[in-house]
Amino acid sequence: MSKNNFRDDFEKNRQSINSDDQFEDNTNEFDENSNESNDFDNQSDQQFPPRNAQRRQRRRNQATNKNRKFGNQNSDSNANGSLDDRHDEDSFNELQHNQQENHLDNEPIHKDDKLSSEKDFNNDASRRNNRHEASNRKHDKDYDNGSLNDDDRHRRNHEEGIDERQDNRNHKDQQNKKSRHGKDAAIAGGAGVAGAAGAKAAKDKRKKDEHHDSKYNEHKDDRDLNNDNQFDQNRKHDKDLHDDHRDAKDNHSKEEPKKGNKGKKAAVGAGAAGAAGAAGVAAAKHKKDHKNNNHKDNHSHNRDHQDDHRNHKHEDGNDGFQAHNGKKKRGLAGILLPLIALLLILAALAIFIGMYLNNDKKDSNQADNKTEQTANKDNNKDSKDKASNDSDKDKASSDKDKDKATNDDDSNDKATTDNDSSNNSSDDNSSSSDNSTSSNSSDNSSSSDNNGNNSNSDNNNGNSQATSNNSSQSNSNNNQSNSSNSGQQTHVVSGNENLYRIAIQYYGEGTVENVNKLKQANGLSSNNISNGQKLIIPQ
């Protein structure tokens, strides 16, 4: 089979991959960065690019760059350790360039690996060994197979073997040109490279352990912060967990030197075997280191799983302990809490009842105040009405008194007028008596003087009797007039008064009948009256 039968148009048209600059950047990061082991482990799962002359040339160039990298460590191992370095560098750079190409092809491979791991688990005796073998087999299969089918893998492996044999022949030619001292240096260089690989593995292991310890410490700190109340109870469990972790770490550290010693022995044997077997031993060493790394990863994963399981149990234990403490505390709490709840309920009820009673009292007081206010208002109204009535009565009485006073004045005036008229009548009577006496004296002049004197005396007596009779009559007339006037009133006209107004004032109504009474009493023929005129007001 020809080497180029395998090519197609896609591979022929591919551009060359010159990754020297990228490799130099990666070597600088490899020396400076503390996480180079994780990067190498992640990139070791990737696949190789297609097999062609460009790839082989790149491998040779990378081998020389790798030798320059390790020149500071050991000058004797630069030329003779190129095979191991070349193999490691190929796996490092080729996996780095094909990371994106094989991302979509990993899912079916993982499914096949899962089936193969389950099959190996049923056939092996120990669960841990079977799990390690399944993981190692998975990574070997990812490393060897890629996304090609079985025929392509067979052809690729065949071409890879041809390339490796050709490289070995070239390397043998170079080795034959050198002296035996160069061969011894190659053996020492191979041993040094193996030791460096072992040291690197130990360093990676220490870093992983430190990373795991930091994770564990962070988890423990968080757990201590969340469980401050159960610090005394958790301290014992944390101590046991730390002891178990330390024992597991010690056991793992005991297993690692053995594996490292095996790797060193294999490297020394590879150096002694010569240039022809160096490639095979290097491949075996790489696979073995790959398995050891997988074993370490699986062991750390199992250890993390155990820690998580223990933490889960510990948290369950804490929950149970808290529940147990809750049951212990529930004795007093079960007694006190209901009592406190009852007291609070009773206090609330008492407060509401007091507020209700106070509101009722306030309402009743307000109602009483309202009734008192209304009663006071009614009393005030009654008193005002009484006062107004009293004032009206007083006014009426004062008016009556005034009317009586005016009537008395009128009666007194009438009495004076009557007395005047009686005096006039008495004067008339006296004059008439004088005339009679004169006539009598003239008639009786012819009589004697004695008779004349007797007659004069008799006349005087008669006159006195007459005057007495007249006075008695006048007095009787005055008494009659006073008695008659006592039932009547007088009114002096003033201003613009008329009979209608006077009738309204004394009778309450200005009717025609009342006006006629006034006319008849006063002898008036018309309604005309003058100011200052006195009118008699009949009853």
Curated annotation (Swiss-Prot):
**Which SMART domains does the UniProt record give?**
LysM (SM00257)
**Keyword Chaperone tagged:** no
Report residue spans for region: Disordered: 1-324, 362-491
Does Cell wall biogenesis/degradation appear among the keywords?
no
State the organism's lineage: Bacteria, Bacillati, Bacillota, Bacilli, Bacillales
Instruction: Output a single Gene Ontology CC term carried by this record.
Output: plasma membrane
* Subcellular location, record wording: Cell membrane
Q: Tell me how this protein sits in the membrane.
A: Single-pass membrane protein
Q: Where is the LysM domain?
A: 489-537
Bias type Low complexity, positions: 35-52, 266-283, 418-490
- Which species is listed as the source? Staphylococcus haemolyticus (strain JCSC1435)
Q: Where are the transmembrane segments?
A: 335-355
Residue spans of biased composition, Polar residues class: 70-81
The name on file for this protein is Probable elastin-binding protein EbpS
Bias class Basic and acidic residues marks the residues at: 1-14, 100-176, 210-226, 233-259, 291-317, 362-371, 378-417
Q: Where is the composition biased (Acidic residues)?
A: 21-34
Show the InterPro entries listed in the entry.
LysM_dom (IPR018392), LysM_dom_sf (IPR036779)
Any Pfam family matching the protein: LysM
Q: Which UniProt keywords apply?
A: Cell membrane, Membrane, Transmembrane, Transmembrane helix
Feature: compositional bias, Basic residues = 53-69
